[in-house]
Amino acid sequence: MGVFMEKLKTYLELIRVKNCITASIGGIIGYLISSNFEIDILKSLLVFFVVFFVCAYGNVINDIFDIEIDRINKPSRPLPSGKIKLNEAKKFSAILLILGLVLSLFINIYALIIAVINALFLYLYAKKYKKYKPIGNFIIGYLTGSVFLFGGVAGKNVMPVVILFLCSLLSIWGREIVKDFEDMEGDKKEGVISLPIKYGKKSLYFATFLVVLAVILSPLPYILKIFGIWYLILIAICDILFIYAMALLLKEPNKETASKVSKFLKIIMNIVLLAFIVGAIKL
């Protein structure tokens, strides 16, 4: 029993179980919003576990491609330490992917399509685009936003979740560029290609453009009469904070400001999520 529990603990470490649970909760939030909190327990469980398994697949694939780097930087991780063999990890990733895709079929065809696209992006990001950030940043934005979209397609009212997905994609894509601006020195040493490395401060204008697009889209659930006034009040506060943060960065485009703005943007994004939840429960 002790050996089994130790092995289980190692596999949970490999999949980064906390990250998987966080992603799954995002999927559930998407489902709650699209179903107006009229939930089906079976669908909720399916959404949770599909997101969990596909996310776990991505984390295992990431460690498979990073095994040589992790031998130096993270030698205690399951693969470089030898606690899990490379072939075992490859088989395990295949099992996780199959479980995720098969379970998504029990939701609907849209869920399957999103699961397949996400699995492909997770593979491509781990293999190639982690160090080529002009595309890698988009993938991170898409994958984060798609968690809500995946849960959303399980419900009846998908439009607000589509808007949440787009706002998440754009704002997180922009935030990733801000983070790259902060990390320029380290990225140069590691041979990473990013927009700030190629274009310097000009890249922050593109990041601002992405965030402003998210701001423009954000009132749509109110304009389309999907959500009420409390949503509009919360989202308006978020929009003002978004614009303030990016204006501050454009005024003082340095590493210290980028670090502060990156953290601030993350806080605002959590308030945006709260606004969508408040809108869905008709407060």
Swiss-Prot record:
It is a multi-pass membrane protein. It catalyses: sn-3-O-(geranylgeranyl)glycerol 1-phosphate + (2E,6E,10E)-geranylgeranyl diphosphate = 2,3-bis-O-(geranylgeranyl)-sn-glycerol 1-phosphate + diphosphate. It comes from the Archaea. One of its GO terms (cellular component) is plasma membrane. Pathway: Membrane lipid metabolism; glycerophospholipid metabolism. The keyword Cell membrane applies. GO terms for biological process: glycerophospholipid biosynthetic process. Its EC number is 2.5.1.42. Its cofactor is Mg(2+). It is found in: Cell membrane. Keywords: Cell membrane, Lipid biosynthesis, Lipid metabolism, Magnesium, Membrane, Phospholipid biosynthesis, Phospholipid metabolism, Transferase, Transmembrane, Transmembrane helix. GO terms for molecular function: geranylgeranylglycerol-phosphate geranylgeranyltransferase activity; magnesium ion binding. InterPro entries: DGGGP_synth, Prenyltransferase_related, UbiA_prenyltransferase, UbiA_sf. Prenyltransferase that catalyzes the transfer of the geranylgeranyl moiety of geranylgeranyl diphosphate (GGPP) to the C2 hydroxyl of (S)-3-O-geranylgeranylglyceryl phosphate (GGGP). This reaction is the second ether-bond-formation step in the biosynthesis of archaeal membrane lipids. Belongs to the UbiA prenyltransferase family. DGGGP synthase subfamily. NCBIfam families: PRK12882.1. This is Digeranylgeranylglyceryl phosphate synthase.
